[in-house]
Every structure is written in C-alpha cells, then in structure tokens.
A protein has these predicted regions:
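N-terminal secretory signal peptides that target proteins for export/translocation
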Residues: 1-9
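Outer membrane pore-forming secretion/assembly proteins and partners of Gram-negative envelopes
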Residues: 2, 29-212
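Bacterial N-terminal signal peptides
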Residues: 12-26
Length: 212
C-alpha cells in the first residue's frame, strides 16, 4: 500500500497538469484574433494632359473634382483617359500589374501613333487600413510604384517599297512614393512629363472597402 501512494500522487499530478493545459488552450483559442478578411478595391487612372489638338475623351463623373484641380493647376488644353485599372486586394496585401497598352504620348504631328505600344507596370508593396493622427480611418499604400516605357517617334525611315515608316525609341519614366487617402476619394499621386510635345501622364488613385 505504501508503494501505491506515490504512484497515485504522481497520476493525480499528471491529470491536474493536463487539465490546466486544456483550459489554457481553450482560453487562447477564444482570445486569438480572427484572420482579417477585409478586402479593398483600388482604382488607378492614367490621364494624359496635352496641348495638342486631339480628341479629348470624356472623363468619368467620379473624377470631376480631380479634373477641376487639374484645370486650375496644369495649363493643358485637353485631357484624355488613357487607362483605368480596377483591382481587389486583401487588407495588408500587395499588388503587382504589368500590361501593354496604347500610346501614352502624342506624336510630333499631334496624333497619338497606334504603331508602337506602351509598356507599363504598377506595384504596391502593401495596401492597408490605418488611423491617421486625427483618428480617421484612411487607406495607406506603401511602396506605390508606377513605371512605363514610352515610344517616342524620332524620324521616318524609308521602307524598301519607298513608303515612309516611323522609327521609335523607347524612353522610361516612373514614380515611387508612399501615400495615404480617404476611402473613395480620388487623389492625384503625381505627374510625369513624356514626349517632345510636352504631354504629361497624371496618376490618380482611389481605394475603398468592398463587400465580403
């Protein structure tokens, strides 16, 4: 009987330890933060400002405030929407896009050439919801990066048939920054000068939470 007493005590101690561990695991499971399933919708607009006599496309109504700001600060005769990119990103996620599009700059003749495309890339290292110094919730984009390779017409080469063929050189342009914005409020990120005609690419971005 004396030998059974220490064994019984040891078994009771093991059972007590297991009970404490089980309670601890249950409490941890109840207090652990659930995975954030919030998604954000980002919209990137590429607007081209030019003084050339080109057909200016109508800009979306959501960009009216941006257009007023552009006309007040940038002395371009015409503005056209070159691209609209809409993407869905998980909160605290990243985004990376590459695409081939139409010309972003006008040729010296005043018309955008359809012969040579533009190559563009858009990256954001992290998109997340944060609180600003006034405790307002805003969307923060860390590592915002836009880059493009723009075809610039240099001369008109002569083909074997005797017809003129335009010659192009590709020039790189881009912008990198960190920005914050209110939800659903388009903001101008920056402008990039392109081409000998003095055209400019205006980067506008907005972001908002989406329904699950």
């Amino acid at each position: 009987m004396k030998n059974q007493t220490p064994l019984r005590a040891m078994l009771l101690a093991v059972c007590a330890a297991l009970c404490v561990m089980s309670v601890s695991l249950n409490v941890h499971a109840q207090t652990a933060q659930p995975d954030d399933q919030t998604n954000l919708e980002t919209e990137l607009y590429l607007i081209v400002g030019t003084n050339q006599d080109v057909d200016a496309s109508r800009l979306p109504a959501s960009l009216e405030s941006v257009v007023r700001q552009l006309r007040a600060t940038l002395p371009f005769k015409n503005y056209r929407l070159a691209a609209t990119l809409i993407n869905r990103i998980k909160n605290e996620g990243k985004l990376e896009l590459s695409w081939i599009g139409g010309p972003l700059a006008s040729s010296q003749s005043g018309a955008a050439s359809a012969v040579a495309p533009s190559f563009s890339q858009f990256k954001v290292r992290q998109v997340k919801l944060v609180r600003n110094t006034e405790n307002q919730q805003v969307v923060q984009m860390l590592g915002f990066n836009f880059g493009a390779r723009i075809p610039i017409q240099t001369s008109g080469a002569i083909a074997a048939s005797g017809a003129g063929v335009p010659a192009f050189n590709y020039e790189s342009t881009g912008l990198s920054t960190d920005i914050s914005m209110r939800e659903s409020e388009p903001v101008i990120v920056g402008t990039l000068s392109v081409g000998p005609s003095g055209d400019a690419i205006i980067l506008v971005v907005s972001a908002k939470r989406t329904q699950k």
